[in-house]
Amino acid sequence: MFILTDVTAGSKVFLPDELDVKQRGIVAISAYTATGDLQGLKQALKEGLTAGLSINEVKEELMHLSAYCGFPRSLNGINTFNDVLSERKSQGISDPEGPKPSKVADSGKYQTGKKVLESLTGRPESGAKTGYAAFVPAIDTLLKEHLFNDLFTRGVLDYKQRELTTVSALIALGGVESQLAGHIRICLNVGFTARQLEQAISLIEIKIGKKQADTGRQVLKNVLTSGN
């Protein structure tokens, strides 16, 4: 990774095409939560807070992950985070709370979720349902109303941060290449570069393993060469 160092201040300056320290923290927290490595997660949480993630940003990331690695992993992550905060407080470390989440609307949830998804993909959703949405319509409703409305409209994390969370979890989990490809396309649509995604994969290789990283690289390559 190319990093410029301010010699006088001793600080690292990340170039525009690099993941910044907060984004790298998001990647690590997501990957460790998804795989259930709570010891690794504990360290990643400390590093994420030190990198500038607020308490509420981390809470939102861990909640967001419930949609991708299940409530048990999400809840374990939340409990681990609570322990980390208690430990830091006992050490006299005060972490910023950060912005509070927005109130989620109870009405029009499906349409709001549909619009969020269209914004993420950059494509209008029209015509007859296909695939899983046609086979089990209720799961399409759940995705729109819960994931893309209840979670995405809470704010605190922007769309880029939420999608980086998602892609990192899917790479770490493995075996979900179809979904990973879709979310890599979304990441590219919301402003991430291929280089930044490659950096996320390299970080996951260090934290989680080469097998998961190699699969992530292949999926990224397939998306880039397909052009859609």
Summary of predicted features, one role per range:
Residues 1-22, 34-50, 71-159, 172, ...:
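Acidic, glycine/proline-rich low-complexity segments that act as flexible tails and inter-domain linkers
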Residues 53-57:
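Winged helix-turn-helix DNA-binding recognition segment
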Residues 44, 177-185, 198:
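Short conserved catalytic/interaction loops centered on acidic-Pro-aromatic/His motifs
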Residues 24-32, 58-62, 161-171, 180, ...:
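Short, structured motif recognition centered on aromatic/hydrophobic residues
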